[in-house]
């Protein structure tokens, strides 16, 4: 799943990049 991949890179990317999660 895509959200699973985002959760994995969430530790690498800054919180400001959370907009890409949409």
From Swiss-Prot:
Its cofactor is Ca(2+). The keyword Metal-binding applies. This is Phospholipase A2. Transmembrane segments: none annotated. It is found in: Secreted. Belongs to the phospholipase A2 family. It catalyses: a 1,2-diacyl-sn-glycero-3-phosphocholine + H2O = a 1-acyl-sn-glycero-3-phosphocholine + a fatty acid + H(+). PA2 catalyzes the calcium-dependent hydrolysis of the 2-acyl groups in 3-sn-phosphoglycerides. GO terms for biological process: lipid catabolic process. Its main location: secreted. It comes from Struthio camelus. One of its GO terms (cellular component) is extracellular region. Keywords: Calcium, Hydrolase, Lipid degradation, Lipid metabolism, Metal-binding, Secreted. Binds 1 Ca(2+) ion per subunit. Optimum pH is 8.2. Stable when incubated for 10 minutes between pH 2 and 11. Retains 70% of its activity when incubated for 10 minutes at pH 1.5. Its EC number is 3.1.1.4. The keyword Calcium applies. The gene is PLA2G1B. Stable after incubation at 70 degrees Celsius for 10 minutes. Retains 80% of its activity after incubation at 80 degrees Celsius for 20 minutes. One of its GO terms (molecular function) is phospholipase A2 activity.
């Amino acid at each position: 799943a895509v959200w699973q991949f985002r959760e994995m890179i969430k530790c690498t990317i800054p919180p400001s990049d959370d907009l890409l999660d949409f």
